[in-house]
Regions:
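Aromatic- and glycine-rich beta-strand/loop motifs that create alpha-glucan
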Residues: 19-44
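Helix-capping/transition residues at the boundaries of transmembrane alpha-helices
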Residues: 36, 97, 108-110, 176, ...
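Secretory targeting signals
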Residues: 51-95, 119-189, 203, 208, ...
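Terminal transmembrane helical anchor/hairpin motif
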Residues: 63-66, 182, 187, 192-268
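Helix-loop-helix units of permease transmembrane domains in multi-pass membrane transporters
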Residues: 95-127, 269
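Short cytosolic juxtamembrane segments of multi-pass membrane proteins
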Residues: 270-274
Length: 274
């Protein structure tokens, strides 16, 4: 092998070494973030509230004489969605704020660590917490549905619905983290809640595209995430299959939105003076 080939192999090896080193730093920050959040009360409070929302559906079903199982089912999915999104907003909006208040970010950035890696580590730690939260609530919901339907009630469309709700919470957590890079934790929560509310009303925004403010609503429809893509509605209860390309498109759209939120957060924190 000539010298050019040897030099090329050496560059590739160094690239892998640097990439592995960066990944280890990101995973270390993610692990610390995960363990920090596990010690917080907000995680268990939201988890308890989510479990209560799932249980409320059982009591609400006794108020309906037509398809009480449907009441339990929709209460359960709504409770899981709201609980995961609430946890993503509350934790994502406060992750960076605590670092600025405690001045721990200054100590971290004194080390050979990129701010982008710091953001990624924080987000991946939050993803770990959201995954654990989602898994526990999903198990609780499946247990309740098995009791209500007197047997196993798990289908492919039901699993797809759970996964899409999980992706929705990841998007919201990413944008909550982005908002926290340039404002306070309280305002980040407010912005994230408004972001979530508007992102679930795209079908209603079409009716507002009239008059002089038509351009404004069109811009909002383009900029805001389409959270409606992650809600399958009554199709899940009646087990109506979704086209595979639609589900795959929703998954790719979720990764695109997460990438956009992290890119925006990285751009802001790189330009910020500490």
């Amino acid at each position: 092998m000539d010298s050019f080939g040897l030099d090329w192999l050496e560059k590739v090896r160094r690239g892998f070494d640097h990439g592995g080193e960066r990944m280890l730093k990101i995973l270390a920050i993610a692990q610390v973030t995960f363990l920090e959040i596990l010690r917080e009360k907000v995680l268990y409070n939201v988890l308890l509230c989510g479990a209560c929302l799932l249980s409320v559906g059982v009591f609400a079903s006794h108020l309906s004489f037509i398809q009480p199982q449907r009441v339990v089912f929709h209460f359960g999915l709504s409770g899981l969605s709201l609980s995961c999104c609430a946890l993503g907003v509350l934790l994502g909006a406060s992750l960076l704020g605590r670092e600025w208040e405690r001045k721990t970010a200054h100590l971290v950035f004194c080390r050979p660590l990129s701010r982008v890696h710091f953001i990624l580590g924080k987000y991946f730690g939050l993803v770990g917490i959201l995954s654990l939260h989602w898994f526990l609530l999903a198990l609780t919901l499946m247990g309740i549905l098995n009791l209500v339907f007197h047997g196993p009630w798990i289908s492919g469309i039901f699993f797809q619905a759970l996964c899409l709700l999980y992706l929705e919470s990841l998007i919201l957590a990413g944008f909550a983290l982005f908002f926290s890079t340039f404002t306070t934790s309280a305002l980040s929560v407010i912005f994230s809640v408004g972001f979530y509310a508007l992102g679930n009303t795209h079908s209603q925004l079409r009716f507002l595209e009239q008059g002089g403010t038509q351009w404004l609503w069109k811009v909002l429809r383009v900029v805001l995430p389409h959270f409606e893509y992650f809600h399958l509605g009554t199709r899940v209860f009646y087990q109506l299959p979704m086209p595979s390309f639609w589900v795959l498109g929703s998954v790719l759209y979720a990764f695109l939105m997460v990438g956009c939120s992290l890119s925006l957060a990285s751009a802001v924190i790189l330009s910020r003076e500490l």
